[in-house]
Amino acid sequence: MEKQIKIALAGNPNCGKTTLFNALTGSNQFVGNWPGVTVEKKEGKLKKHDDVVIMDLPGIYSLSPYTLEEVVARNYLITERPDAILNIIDGTNLERNLYLTTQLTELGIPVVIAINMMDIVRKNGDEINVKELSRELGCEIIEISALKGDGVMDAAEAAIRAAKGTKTVPMHTFSGPVEHAIAHIEEAAVHSMPEEQQRWYAIKIFERDDKVLEKLTIPTETMNHIEEDIKAAETELDDDAESIITNERYIYIAQLIKGCYKKKSTEKLSTSDKIDKVVTNRWLGLPIFAVVMFLVYWVAMVGVGAPATDWANDGVFGDGWHLFTIGAADYEEATAEYDDQITRRD
């Protein structure tokens, strides 16, 4: 009898994970609750593959146990250790979804990524370089539309191949101080674990994850040495350990998106923005400034300035002033006669 293959579906809430689960299993699924909690548990057999079980994990944003759903999903992944993880990503919101991906690839379990809603991505005019993203993350990526059923069986077949192949090796690394501390933690606290699991546990110890520390019961002396490494990294990077890991994940994701994702520009530039774009150009700015200053000088000194100055000099303050005295003598004579008549009457 062939060994049963377990594939876990993992992804953010509302990424299309449950739609994909229904498409893969049809009516051949079982619904219940996870032991001890009210979180729904769904599993089923892959269509036409009785030896493949699909587990629909609760929607989560990370593997840090902040919510009940995250606790349930994480416990299943690190305890049951499925043969492969099919990570569903919303293609219209890569940055948020890839945060979980960076953690899943550290578990030492084969990971296949299914980028969902690719039909919407294309409709929006956006582009995802799937080949480059796959190379950077170190795992196979399949484009799907769970709602339309496009590519769903291709994603399942890729997960089956991954389950029978090699483990996913995380491609991203953290900064020097963090990697230095993680290496010491692996050597001091988790060296007896299977090699593919060591890095994830070391990162969680660096983050001071309470549930991991409680599970491992690391000797006090060893933990004191580890704390020295963690505090050294915190001092050098001026932040707490958990925030350091979070920030560096997002820095890595930003670099991924910059190289693999191209968003269609939908902004229409206003007239003033278009002018600004030209006049502030590093190559055109100075020539345009010189031309504008020349025009201002020409208008002031030649175009308007010279005629206006000539008119003022000749017409107002020069010989032209006599124009204003035309008829003045007659006016003065008439005024004098009028004054004489008034005097005689008196």
Please describe what each predicted stretch is:
Residues 73, 261-278:
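Cytosolic juxtamembrane amphipathic/interface segments immediately preceding
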Residues 267, 279-289:
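Membrane-interface helix starts
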